[in-house]
Regions:
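Short, surface-exposed acidic/glycine-rich loop or hinge patches that mediate macromolecular interfaces
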Residues: 67-68, 90
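Active-site mouth loops of central-metabolism enzymes
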Residues: 1-11, 62-65, 116-119
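P-loop/Walker A phosphate-binding loop and immediately adjacent motor/lid segment at beta-alpha junctions
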Residues: 58-60, 107-108
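Short glycine/proline-rich, acidic loop/turn segments that cap or connect secondary-structure elements
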Residues: 87-108
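Extended, intrinsically disordered, low-complexity segments
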Residues: 102-138
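Alpha/beta enzyme core
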Residues: 1-57, 71-80, 93, 97-100, ...
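Catalytic cores of large soluble enzymes that bind and process phosphate-bearing ligands
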Residues: 6, 40, 87, 91, ...
Length: 138
């Protein structure tokens, strides 16, 4: 995680950008990246708090790359001021495994529309679980 600290969003720069552009949301770096991590990242929650204090109240803070981040760290980031969490890689990976297992389980005899429906329901359930885990208690 130390290797990416130089890329962390600076609160003063975020404030200037948000005020100049009047953006609705701002994706910031405080320890996450897109994709699958080799080792779990450690989030700089204090940086999120500093960013939340610096940027306008109507500009939402976005966390990219939440797959692989411990759920309690994501919850801490939400409590500190993140309003949007992008989480996809692990969900896609789990759904791909589900589809492969379903094809193997049926010896390849499952019809495409049945496979698609099963994959959709699996991913929907996974997404609901993630949403519940990331729910803000405020």
């Amino acid at each position: 995680n130390e290797d990416i600290r130089e890329f962390f969003t600076e609160p003063a720069e975020a404030k200037e950008f948000a005020e100049r552009t009047k953006c609705d949301a701002l994706a910031v770096c405080f320890g996450t990246m897109h994709g699958i991590y080799a080792e779990p990242p450690v989030l700089d929650i204090d940086r999120v708090k500093e960013l939340r204090e610096a940027i306008p109240d109507d500009t939402r803070i976005v966390m990219h790359g939440a797959s692989g981040v411990e759920f309690d760290q994501v919850q801490n980031a939400i409590t500190a001021g993140c309003s949007k969490v992008n989480y996809y890689s692990y969900m896609a990976k789990a759904t791909t495994k589900f589809v492969a297992d379903k094809v193997a389980e049926t010896d390849g005899k499952i019809a495409y529309h049945e496979l698609q429906e099963a994959a959709y329901e699996f991913m929907k359930g996974y997404a609901k679980d993630v949403i519940k885990a990331f729910k803000n208690g405020k």
